[in-house]
Amino acid sequence: MTFKIFATCDIGKEALDRLRQKGWDVEVYDHIEPPPKILILEKVKGGVDALVTTLRDPIDEEVFAAGKAAKLKVVAQDAVGFDNIDRAAANKHKIPFSNTADVLTDATAEFAFLIMGAVARKTWPSEQMVREQTWSTWHPYHPWLGDEVTGKTVAVIGTGRIGKSFIKKAVGFDMDVLCHDPAFEDRKFVESVRRVLDLRHREGLVPRRQTIDYVPFEEALRRADFVSLHVALTRPGESDWPTYHLMDERRLQMMKPTAYLVNTSRGPVVDENALARALLEGWIAGAALDVFEKEPLPAESPLRDDRLKLKLRMFHHFASAGRATRLSPDPDVGMAGRTVQAVIDVLENRYGSPGKVPYVVNKEAF
């Protein structure tokens, strides 16, 4: 049987070729900007069997209703997040949608650690001096001396897959770790890390015994030199511990004036107006952000204030942008591979029901 697939962006030739090799018709919207919603609706009404989407595409009630009336069998999201997909509408019309959970774990954690070091060590002014040819001489006490990461204390807020991967990197830099996760405290993981830390100390590999433990949220904020956010976005009413504006004025003021905030989770977890004020008024030393409340970052955002240049590093939702993580056709390695595998599993009915497909999110609809 021949199926028709419409991809709203090019997720990689190798991965999409897995569909083409089956004789399936694959159409790719190969432009920098996302397709207009009217085009997505046109493709759905025209009888595509699968949509390959990204966070930029509004897949709402209108799309799912059109899909139910036509032939749409699956929406395969090339991302972990699915804020753009109306889950209730998907369930109502019995159309499964998938995501790429797990495969970008290490890439995201790695990037969080890299930008934490970048903002603390104030790397940007140094590069700017070289590029602008204002590097005239060396001086040991120039005004942008940075803060070391090694041996400091980091609070990891959210100890799911990405949080755990971040912790593994932090302990390699001899950091003490304060964990907080209201959903699930993985004591077994913490104990295993603690045993490794004890062994390192006994073998003389480190001069002191590092520590790791779960602590209350506000205690973590007060004690940490770095706070790294790895939580899902939940709004009031959706969770007992909503994370929308989790880092607001009150909580930013709890942090040390020498501490740094890192966010690679979801933009609305941080109140950006409060963060801009915290940086300008010196409540905290700096911040590194890969996600924002509105993306792309609006021209009027307070985070664009030139006075924040030395204290704030900003990136364009870039954390998972590792070559293998994004493009590998292997579903155990790459987002593209996992997206394509979800399409194959649903269209070929490999599991007997969409609800049994490993990468389908809305299993409750089936």
Predicted features by range, described:
Residues M1-S98, R222, D248, M254:
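An N-terminal-biased, well-structured beta-alpha scaffold segment characteristic
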Residues C9, D181-A183:
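N-terminal Rossmann-fold cofactor-binding loop
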Residues V28, V177-C179:
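Short beta-strand "acidic-cap" motif of Rossmann-like dinucleotide-binding folds
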Residues I59-V63, F184-P302:
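Rossmann-like adenosine-cofactor binding region
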Residues H93-I95, T100-T153, Y351-V360:
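Phosphate-binding beta-alpha-beta segment of Rossmann-like dinucleotide-binding domains, i.e.
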Residues S98, R250, T258-F366:
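Rossmann-like dinucleotide-binding domain for NAD(H)/NADP(H)
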Residues T159-G160:
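Glycine-rich Rossmann-fold phosphate-binding loop(s) that bind the pyrophosphate
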Residues G163-K164:
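N-terminal Rossmann-fold NAD(P) dinucleotide-binding loop
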